[in-house]
C-alpha cells in the first residue's frame, strides 16, 4: 500500500469521524494496524510520508537517559501536531485554529518540552503557519487540503513509530540505552524481533543491560489536546492548549462554543456564573475515576450514573457554557427560593423556558446538536438546522453520556417551566 492510498484511507477516516460529531486525531483500528505493520517492515515509509521521522526522533530522544518516558512524551507531541493539522483540514473556517500562541500550555509543556524550536517551526510551516512575532504563529494562506492530510498522516505515523520503539524496549527488557543505537537497530531491522535481537547482541558486548524501570500506574486520561489557550489559563492543569481559547467542536461557528473538557473534569455549576451559584460541600461530590489515557473512542466513555440534579449540575455545566441568564435576577427559581427570596421577586421576571427537545427528536432518541440561540436540542439531520447554521450558536454534543445529560436537562427545564408557580 503506497503513501497515496494511505492518505486516502486516512482522509476517509477523518471525515467519517466528523460525520459522527468528532473532529480529532485518527483512531481507526484497522488503519492503525495496517500502518503499524507497514512501518515495522519498512522504516523508509517515513521518507515517502515526508514526516522528518529521523530528525524528530533523534532530536526528541537525544541525551535522554530513559527512553521509555521520552517516547511517551514524543507520542503526545506528535498527537498534538496531528490534531493541529486535522483542525485546519476539517474546520478551515474556524479562525481560532489559524493562530498558535507559543506561550500556550500545549506549546510550552507538550511540544517545546520534547522538540527544538527549529523543528517545531518546520512542522508548523508544513501546515501553513508562519511566525508573526515572538509569541504567535499564524496561517496566512491555507495549504491545499491534500497537504494537510499528508501532514496529519505523517504525525499519525510518528505516533505509531513511538509505540513500535516502545514495544522494542519492552521486549528488550531495558529502556536505558543510547538513543542512536535504538534508532540504528530500528532502521536496520524488518520486524520487532530482529530489532530486539540486534540490540541484545550490541548490549551484550558492553555490559549487562540495566533492568527496565518499573512501570507506573496507567497514565490518567487527559482531555483531548488542543493548542489554543494561554499558559496562565491552563497552568497546573492537565488540559494542554495551543490556541487562544478552548478548542471548539466541528459544527459550532462562534468562539464561545469552543471545545469543552470531558464530563468528569467539568465544573459543578448548573446555572452558570451569573449570580451566586450554589456549591455543595466538597465531601458531597464523589470523585469520578478517569479512564486510561487514549480512551478517546465513544464506546469507552464512562456510563453515567443514575440521574440526579446533583450529577447533572456536576457533569453538564462549567463557566460560560450553558448560555443561561447572566444576572442573579434570572437565576433558577428553585435556587432563588432556596436563598430565601420571596416567590414574587422572581415571578415578575420573564424567565426563558430553558432548553427544549426539538420535534425532530423521536421519543428516546438522543440529540446530536444544541442551538444556544433557539435553546433547542436537534438530531443530526434535522430539517430546521439550515436556518440555525448561518447565525446561531450551535454546539456538537460528543458521546452518548453528554447527549443523555443534555436531554435530561431539557426535560428538567420543561418540567420547571410548566410546573405551578414557575410562571406569573
From Swiss-Prot:
<keyword id="KW-0597">Phosphoprotein</keyword>
<dbReference type="GO" id="GO:0005737">
    <property type="term" value="C:cytoplasm"/>
</dbReference>
<feature type="modified residue" description="Phosphoserine">
    <location>
        <position position="327"/>
    </location>
</feature>
<dbReference type="InterPro" id="IPR048839">
    <property type="entry name" value="SPATA2_PUB-like"/>
</dbReference>
<dbReference type="Pfam" id="PF21388">
    <property type="entry name" value="SPATA2_PUB-like"/>
</dbReference>
<feature type="region of interest" description="Disordered">
    <location>
        <begin position="273"/>
        <end position="300"/>
    </location>
</feature>
<comment type="similarity">
    <text>Belongs to the SPATA2 family.</text>
</comment>
<feature type="region of interest" description="Disordered">
    <location>
        <begin position="233"/>
        <end position="258"/>
    </location>
</feature>
<protein>
    <recommendedName>
        <fullName>Spermatogenesis-associated protein 2-like protein</fullName>
    </recommendedName>
</protein>
